[in-house]
């Protein structure tokens, strides 16, 4: 009796399967084989289409994910060169089929924007001076693409997977030429506005000035940042010496500071309000996320951990509240897989990258008139600096520009 039941069940199963195959004989190949499981397929970010964006200049898209596997500008633990691979691997449960962001009410992979994975910049680990040139040239190349939304005359936007934090400098250099001076929201446990002379070494060279802790100081001195619309958020690092001298130096670079502990007093809402109060609605914004902004319990796989950080849940909520900003570029950096045995750091990195892409998509295409206006203001400020012999913008410079009638006209 049991044998007869087994045979009957097998026949029914065969009949059902045969019927399904017959009903789908006319299915095309994409319908049959176009969807991957999280564990199948080539590991692009979120199973996005892969395009060699540095080579194929004819390809049009709106948002690109680009890896920059560079980590030879670190001051402590390395390993972030393997970050892009790890973040892509951790993103494999993201797909366009199952990509709806319940926090934002959109699926960024099925909306107006064409989102692709551009692969990696093959940056040298042998020579930091050459690496900086390579990364800058790569970003300039990427920004010479046309976006699929061709009516706005602006290039695609990019989310970068690092790599150590120094990779923000070549990105800002390239973006400055396209968008003008940028307001930077810098999620990090460290200031990263240290002058190279702050590092404890008698030995210095031009190459040694370029580090993952000095790049925002360099960016300021090169006129890449807005004067007073930049934010550090999540700070909790120890400072130099026996005073707030590092904060005094940071003031001169044009940053406002939000310390990690502030979230305990005013909650997430107060953090968001403080960020938004410093970022005008008419400037292009770059968001940089150093994974060490998170507490080591949530992100142990990084080079310079600091205890007492935010949780992933809190950072995601803060990013979600910034979706109305004019986000023209972003990065997630300092993910170091050798120190991430359970992969929770790379998983956090993949989620943060997803949230940043969501922000770009939900905001929609950037208004080209806004960018034109910002470029004009930025160029006039730079010209004023050069005429007056200033190497970087300060309040003193702005006062003097007005007195000399180098007034920035709208």
From Swiss-Prot:
Keyword Nuclease: no
Obligatory cofactor(s): Mn(2+)
Keywords for this protein: Arginine metabolism, Hydrolase, Manganese, Metal-binding
Binding site for Mn(2+) 2: 188, 190, 290, 292
Pathway assigned to this chain's UniProt record: Amino-acid degradation; L-arginine degradation
GO molecular function, one term: metal ion binding
Keyword field contains Ion transport: no
Source species: Kluyveromyces lactis (strain ATCC 8585 / CBS 2359 / DSM 70799 / NBRC 1267 / NRRL Y-1140 / WM37)
Any Pfam family hit: Arginase
Encoding gene, per UniProt annotation: GBU1
Protein name: Guanidinobutyrase
Catalysed reaction, written as an equation: 4-guanidinobutanoate + H2O = urea + 4-aminobutanoate
EC number: 3.5.3.7
BP term (GO), one: putrescine biosynthetic process from arginine, via agmatine
Family listed: Belongs to the arginase family. Agmatinase subfamily.
Cofactor note: Binds 2 manganese ions per subunit.
UniProt enzyme class: hydrolase
Domain of life: Eukaryota
Positions that bind Mn(2+) 1: 165, 188, 192, 290
Function summary: Catalyzes the hydrolysis of 4-guanidinobutanoate to gamma-aminobutyrate (GABA) and urea. Involved in an alternative, arginase-independent arginine degradation pathway via GABA.
């Amino acid at each position: 009796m049991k044998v007869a039941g087994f045979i009957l069940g097998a026949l029914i199963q065969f009949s059902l399967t045969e019927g399904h195959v017959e009903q789908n004989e006319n299915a095309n190949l994409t319908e049959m084989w176009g969807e991957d499981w999280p564990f199948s397929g080539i590991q692009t970010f979120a199973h996005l289409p892969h395009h060699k964006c540095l080579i194929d200049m004819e390809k049009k898209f709106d948002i690109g994910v680009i890896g920059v596997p560079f980590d030879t500008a670190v001051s402590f633990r390395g390993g972030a060169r393997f970050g892009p691979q790890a973040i892509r691997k951790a993103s494999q449960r993201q797909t366009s089929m199952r990509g709806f962001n319940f926090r934002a009410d959109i699926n960024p992979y099925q909306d107006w924007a064409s989102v692709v994975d551009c692969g990696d910049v093959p940056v040298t680990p042998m020579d930091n001076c050459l690496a900086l040139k390579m990364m800058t040239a790569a970003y300039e190349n990427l920004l010479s693409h046309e976006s699929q939304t061709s009516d706005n005359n602006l290039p695609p936007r990019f989310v970068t997977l690092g790599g150590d934090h120094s990779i923000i400098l070549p990105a800002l250099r390239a973006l400055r030429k396209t968008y003008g001076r940028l307001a930077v929201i810098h999620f990090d446990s460290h200031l990263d506005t240290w002058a190279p002379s702050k590092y404890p070494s008698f030995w210095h060279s031009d190459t040694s000035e370029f580090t993952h802790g000095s790049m925002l100081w360099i960016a300021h001195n090169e006129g890449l940042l807005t004067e007073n619309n930049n934010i550090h958020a999540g700070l909790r690092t120890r400072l130099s010496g026996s005073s707030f001298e590092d904060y005094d130096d940071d003031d001169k670079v044009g940053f406002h500071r939000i310390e990690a502990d502030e979230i305990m007093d005013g909650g997430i809402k107060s953090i968001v309000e403080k960020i938004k109060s410093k970022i005008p609605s008419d400037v292009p914004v770059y968001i940089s996320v150093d994974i060490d902004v998170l507490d080591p319990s949530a992100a142990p796989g990084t080079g310079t951990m600091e205890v007492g950080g935010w949780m992933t849940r809190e950072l995601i909520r803060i990013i979600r509240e910034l979706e109305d900003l004019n986000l023209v570029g972003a990065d997630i950096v300092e993910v170091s897989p050798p120190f991430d045995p359970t992969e929770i750091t790379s998983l956090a990195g993949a989620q943060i990258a997803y949230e940043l892409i969501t922000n770009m998509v939900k905001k929609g295409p950037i208004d080209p008139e806004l960018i034109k206006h910002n470029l004009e203001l930025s160029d006039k400020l730079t010209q004023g600096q050069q005429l007056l012999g200033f190497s970087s913008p300060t309040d003193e410079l702005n006062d003097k520009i007005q007195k000399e009638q180098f007034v920035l006209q709208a």
